[in-house]
């Protein structure tokens, strides 16, 4: 659900003792055997058992393709122990053809969501879709861009910044996308949602035009009273997953099934020579004023006898460097930081938002440190969450990773 490509390879009992290979409703046949593929099918794009050693190349190539293609996500390959020990001739292995969509769609190990995504190819006429958006933009008085994590996932950050600069309208950021623009950015207009801030919600709820880029608008973004979300707005949403455009919690006036990078490339061309209307500037000033007038950290919070977590986050982020990476656990660790953080240009802020499972903080910080080639990482964890993977402190110590850990004792 967080659109992160991942490949999982698990070990399994030998094929002869796999219960799934027999038409008998057994709970278990092999020693410590479990039909893991059935367990994970609903949470993966592709989950399969490698039944033939000669298909290892094809299955691996297919898994890698699906993990990265379209909306990224996890794939799972379960390998029986007799397959693990099998001899193969690399020259005789079958390869996967990513262009043979017909054969790919016949694979029963694809999830329904993956099949839907492949069947509904990106056929939206982007030129006509963009013309309609620009037409509605010209009619609007209070336009807003709602940016989500899909901006970075699609590799569109630079072109996104170019497009939004040309449009010159307020930008609000969705959960796990707050680091797209820093707090001092001239178009920053807050963070909407049930765990957002007042300014961000005011920006969206008073808008009459909303362009959603790379956000699936989950319930925490639109609230449980989703019928009232952006109630005055004409809404256009760009998403690579067609199912996200048809959710019962959304009413989108102009759904666009497209790759965000392709959409933005065309949009920036259409915006050449565009002049920002005065009324759009006026609404941007109003939104910026709301950000100033409705801070997350109120003056009375500082009077608390014990440390208020919002005050702590306010002070912590004021002391961080512009190139720091911040990784949080869930609960108070992420809610207070994602609301109160005054993000500086160049900082990155991460959490696991879809399932929001406890225990993410330490392993997430380790992953962020490795992926950023050893940048300093600030890890914010709850005292319950950190216990779930506390053994990873040894990994941090063993590799001398520059990770600073703050634990909320609540």
Locate the predicted segments by residue:
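Glycine-/acidic-rich phosphate or pyrophosphate-binding loops and their flanking alpha/beta elements
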Residues: 62, 128-138, 312-315, 361-372
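Active-site diphosphate/adenylate-binding microenvironment
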Residues: 288-363, 368-369
């Amino acid at each position: 659900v967080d659109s992160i490509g991942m490949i999982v390879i698990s070990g399994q009992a030998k094929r002869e003792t796999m219960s799934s290979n027999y038409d008998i409703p057994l709970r278990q046949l092999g020693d410590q055997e479990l039909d893991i593929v059935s367990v994970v099918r609903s949470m993966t794009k592709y989950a399969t058992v490698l039944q033939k050693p000669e298909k290892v190349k094809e299955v691996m190539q297919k898994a890698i393709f699906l993990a990265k293609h379209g909306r990224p996500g996890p794939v799972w390959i379960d390998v029986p122990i007799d397959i693990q020990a099998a001899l193969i001739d690399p020259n005789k292995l079958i390869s996967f053809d990513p262009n043979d969509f017909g054969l790919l769609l016949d694979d029963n190990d694809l999830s329904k969501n993956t099949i839907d995504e492949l069947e509904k190819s990106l056929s939206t006429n982007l030129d006509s879709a963009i013309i309609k958006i620009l037409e509605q933009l010209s009619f609007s008085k209070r336009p807003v861009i709602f940016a989500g994590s899909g901006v970075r996932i699609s590799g569109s950050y630079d072109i996104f910044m170019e497009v939004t600069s040309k449009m010159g309208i307020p930008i609000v950021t969705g959960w796990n996308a707050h680091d797209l623009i820093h707090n001092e950015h001239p178009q920053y207009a807050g963070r909407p949602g049930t765990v957002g801030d007042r300014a961000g919600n005011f920006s969206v709820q008073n808008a009459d035009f909303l362009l959603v880029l790379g956000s699936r608008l989950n319930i925490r973004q639109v609230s449980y009273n989703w019928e009232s979300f952006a109630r005055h707005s004409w809404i256009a949403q760009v998403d690579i997953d067609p199912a996200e455009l048809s959710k019962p919690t959304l009413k989108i006036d102009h759904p666009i099934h497209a790759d965000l990078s392709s959409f933005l490339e065309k949009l920036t061309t259409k915006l050449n020579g565009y002049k920002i209307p005065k009324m759009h500037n006026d609404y941007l000033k109003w939104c910026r004023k709301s950000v100033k007038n409705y801070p997350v950290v109120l003056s009375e919070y500082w009077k608390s006898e014990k440390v208020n977590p919002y005050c702590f986050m306010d002070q912590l982020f004021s002391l961080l460097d512009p190139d720091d990476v911040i990784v949080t656990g869930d609960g108070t660790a992420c809610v207070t930081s994602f609301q109160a953080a005054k993000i500086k240009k160049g900082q990155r802020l991460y959490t696991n938002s879809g399932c929001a499972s406890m225990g993410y903080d330490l392993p997430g910080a380790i992953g962020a440190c490795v992926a950023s080639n050893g940048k300093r990482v600030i890890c914010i964890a709850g005292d319950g969450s950190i216990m779930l993977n506390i053994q990873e402190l040894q990994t941090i110590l063993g590799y001398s990773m520059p990770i600073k850990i703050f634990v909320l004792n609540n």
